[in-house]
Amino acid sequence: MNDDSNGRRRRPAAFPVGTEDATSRELEQTPRRAPGSFSDKIVMTPDADDPFIETTAAIEALNPPEARPPRRRLSFGKIAAGAFGILISLAVGLWVDRLVRDLFSRADWLGYGAVAVVAIGAAAFLIVVAREIFGMMQLTAVQALKADLAAAAVAGKAQAARAATARLVHLLAGNPRTAKGRARLADTEGEIIDAPHLVDLTERELLAPLDREARRIILGAAKRVSIVTAVSPRALVDLGYVLYESARMIRAMAELYGGRPGTLGLLRLMRDVVAHLAVTGSIAVGDSLVQQILGHGLASKLSARLGEGVINGLMTARIGIAAMDLCRPMPFRALKRPSIGDFLADLAPGAGRTESATGKA
């Protein structure tokens, strides 16, 4: 098609369709900056001249190292406890047998009633034992799954990672917080994903909401311990409430991550947590360390009871972090492990400003 009477053809050109965006036109008209070099040098501040280095080191010193379950070994103490347990069980059985025989000698209906009571008690005892054994096996299965996921990520075997991920999905299937993550992982079943990336994706989708809930549990327990310590009249009350709140927090942490421990399982978890903190030397907080975190001026203005409340709250937070390490079915890879600094601003408002200033520096 000709565009004039001389028969010359129109050259190809581009024409905008519709209205142009005013922002895009302004960007096109704005002249671009020419490349250039900058002569300003980066000044590194030595650690000796850093005014926040002591506070940063003090906060990092409060973070307990990652807790790992100790190896279960057969010791002479366990053998002795088992032997004495069998002996006590035999003694109780003989006493019950003698009691039932004596009741039968007095009256038949008393004997049959005693037999019925013994049968009901034995059945209830067996149910309790079965629940405790199931709880211990569940804790062991969580630790085995944690080791399998870590090994699959290191070895790079996609099939092993898929199998371990499926076990984790089955473990957390009853938790409504993981519904969205389980749906997203189900959409990736037909895709080809490397083992490390699959493990990281599983951690982000399944454990991110659980980690947020675990932080909330730890912070709530630490706040309650701080308040009770500040207002309680006796140190014995402080110790009792710290033990109660720690046991409650550890049980909630285990149930959150699918552990569901019984009484013996809870005692085992508490023993592992306390043993880990005692071995690593992070069970107590020194006064000098608290002064570095809170500031000497603020620490001197605080009352003794309020200072003890902050100390017990920090100790409870460290117990919660160690319990989180033991109960979590995956090691921390893609997500950040919580630290004392995450809870310090809520327990000690003055320390929160110090920590923020440290981060800006």
Swiss-Prot record:
Domain of life: Bacteria
Entry keyword Chaperone: no
UniProt entry tagged with the keyword Transmembrane: yes
InterPro entries, per the entry: DUF697, UPF0283
Ranges for region Disordered: 1-40
Bilayer-crossing regions: 76-96, 109-129
Keywords: Cell inner membrane, Cell membrane, Membrane, Transmembrane, Transmembrane helix
Compartment(s) of residence: Cell inner membrane
Disulfide bond positions: none
Topological relation to the membrane, as annotated: Multi-pass membrane protein
GO CC entries: plasma membrane
Compositional bias segments (type: Basic and acidic residues): 22-31
Similarity field: Belongs to the UPF0283 family.
NCBIfam families, per the entry: hyp_HI0043 (TIGR01620)
Entry protein name: UPF0283 membrane protein Smed_1530
Organism for this UniProt entry: Sinorhizobium medicae (strain WSM419)
